[in-house]
Amino acid sequence: MLNDKTAIVTGASRGIGRSIALDLAKSGANVVVNYSGNEAKANEVVDEIKSMGRKAIAVKADVSNPEDVQNMIKETLSVFSTIDILVNNAGITRDNLIMRMKEDEWDDVININLKGVFNCTKAVTRQMMKQRSGRIINVSSIVGVSGNPGQANYVAAKAGVIGLTKSSAKELASRNITVNAIAPGFISTDMTDKLAKDVQDEMLKQIPLARFGEPSDVSSVVTFLASEGARYMTGQTLHIDGGMVM
């Protein structure tokens, strides 16, 4: 389905990003596994992709740093020569109530979760416009639609991603580049596993399908959006939340 397409997945060393990278590879894509800290985990993902008979490289880059992002794009093109798919997945949390939130907690989340999406989108557009094709998939969150107490920075960033997705889609459509977002709900990862059991139980009550999502529930939708099956979709945000927000 994605044979010999080149995909960049940011924050791909673990969790949802790892699942996305592996799912794209299973569909035939070669993958750039971006990471910012855990090189060993990123290399494990690369090895798994290579075991499928696909090509992969791990590239360290802080997505909030435009120079890092440009270097990642240069390395990608030197190895693969095209960039067909960008998945903006990298993200962090620094939760706190508004009245207690420190400026660096706000800035860190906005810089990674929103500015990082802008930096990577900007960096790939020239190549995708030259190719007259491309797929950009941005990972937002259901809380970017609904809001969530104690996460003003994260919610603002993820809501911003939805707006950026729409503007990017309108700007790039004439060059056959689609831009869509996904809004996952409560997905079981090492990040969410740290939440207290009572918090998890309360979340579960809000989900009509009565279970937490798995990373594969998210990655399968990303793979669809990267495929020809989604060629007439752009500017959309797909909820992957078990019906939590309707």
From Swiss-Prot:
Gene Ontology MF terms in the entry: 3-oxoacyl-[acyl-carrier-protein] reductase (NADPH) activity; NAD binding; oxidoreductase activity, acting on the CH-OH group of donors, NAD or NADP as acceptor
Keywords, alphabetical: Fatty acid biosynthesis, Fatty acid metabolism, Lipid biosynthesis, Lipid metabolism, NADP, Oxidoreductase
Catalysed reactions, as listed in the record: a (3R)-hydroxyacyl-[ACP] + NADP(+) = a 3-oxoacyl-[ACP] + NADPH + H(+)
GO biological process, one term: fatty acid elongation
EC numbers, comma separated: 1.1.1.100
Family: Belongs to the short-chain dehydrogenases/reductases (SDR) family.
Function, as annotated: Catalyzes the NADPH-dependent reduction of beta-ketoacyl-ACP substrates to beta-hydroxyacyl-ACP products, the first reductive step in the elongation cycle of fatty acid biosynthesis.
Subunit details: Homotetramer.
Protein name: 3-oxoacyl-[acyl-carrier-protein] reductase FabG
Organism: Bacillus subtilis (strain 168)
